[in-house]
């Protein structure tokens, strides 16, 4: 299905990662496959908000018994799970997870990010400023692309 197929997220480094949507057990990879996963809330049709980023050496078993999925579903309104697999090396999984957490700033990863630091607050403020800048949306809506000063 096109609507629940693949989505690309960008980490703090600017690197893009292409994730696959997982809606049921049958679409999950085989047991023993490592990777990265994201809990997501779908706002409107194509506006996805990442809520939690994690890594696992066995992504199937981790997602089927994840302790934070209930909280993500009931309190944050999570609707989907996206996975990036296979990533065999633990060091690569750790590096990608950290890059995505710093770039996406998901609310359920706040304790792991150290969001109380002034640098994190400044990054979040800059992100919100870009998000609410109407001129940056003109390119998406068919108008002229915004000029940055």
Functional labels for PLM-detected ranges:
Residues 1-51, 55-149:
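Boundary/linker segments flanking structured domains
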């Amino acid at each position: 299905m096109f609507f629940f197929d693949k989505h690309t997220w960008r980490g703090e480094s600017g690197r893009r990662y292409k994730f696959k949507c997982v809606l049921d057990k049958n679409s999950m990879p085989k047991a023993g496959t490592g990777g990265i996963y994201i809990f997501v809330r779908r706002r409107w049709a194509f506006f996805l908000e990442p809520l939690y980023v994690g890594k696992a050496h066995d992504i199937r078993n981790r997602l089927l018994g994840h302790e934070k999925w209930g909280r993500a579903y009931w309190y944050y309104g999570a609707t989907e799970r996206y996975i990036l697999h296979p990533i065999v090396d633990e060091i690569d999984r750790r590096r990608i997870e950290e890059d995505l957490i710093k770039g996406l700033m998901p609310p359920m990863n706040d304790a792991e990010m150290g969001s109380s630091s002034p640098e994190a607050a400044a990054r979040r403020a800059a992100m919100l400023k870009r998000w609410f800048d109407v001129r940056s949306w003109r390119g998406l809506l068919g108008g002229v692309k915004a000029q940055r000063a």
